[in-house]
Design a protein with these regions (language model features):
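Conserved GNAT acetyl-CoA-binding A-motif
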Residues: 60-73
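Conserved acetyl-CoA-binding loop-helix of GNAT-fold acetyltransferases
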Residues: 46-60
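Conserved active-site alpha-helix within GNAT-family acetyltransferase domains
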Residues: 72-96
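A short, internal acetyl-CoA/4′-phosphopantetheine-binding micro-motif in the GNAT/acyltransferase core
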Residues: 39-46
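Conserved beta-hairpin
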Residues: 8-22
């Protein structure tokens, strides 16, 4: 069972099993949908599939029907293997001050 505890940063939650900290997730919620914009796990847990377990825990809430994640391009195949569909009709664009 995963526990999501609010942090001092808006919409960011520390994720733990109660005794062990796993990382943190930032997400926005609208109606019955969640959009995760940042998911970080503790470095020593990399390669253990913790990211998809955290997202599955969010999706398992009875009032959530859909979860989306903003992912770096190099992690797209990881999330596709976890059951996510890549929707290539959207792309994040960034503009910085000159």
């Amino acid at each position: 069972r995963m526990v999501f505890e609010p942090t001092s940063q808006d919409q960011t939650f520390t994720v733990s099993t109660g005794a062990q900290r796993l990382g943190y997730v930032t997400y926005h919620r609208k109606d019955r949908s969640i959009v995760a914009t940042n998911l970080q796990i503790e470095p020593y847990l990399e390669g253990l599939d913790i990211e998809s377990q955290i997202l599955d825990a969010l999706l398992s809430h009875e009032d959530v029907e859909q979860i989306q994640i903003l992912s770096p391009i190099n992690l797209i195949s990881y999330y596709e293997e976890a059951g996510f569909e890549c929707q290539t009709k959207h792309i994040l664009l960034t503009k910085k001050k000159s």
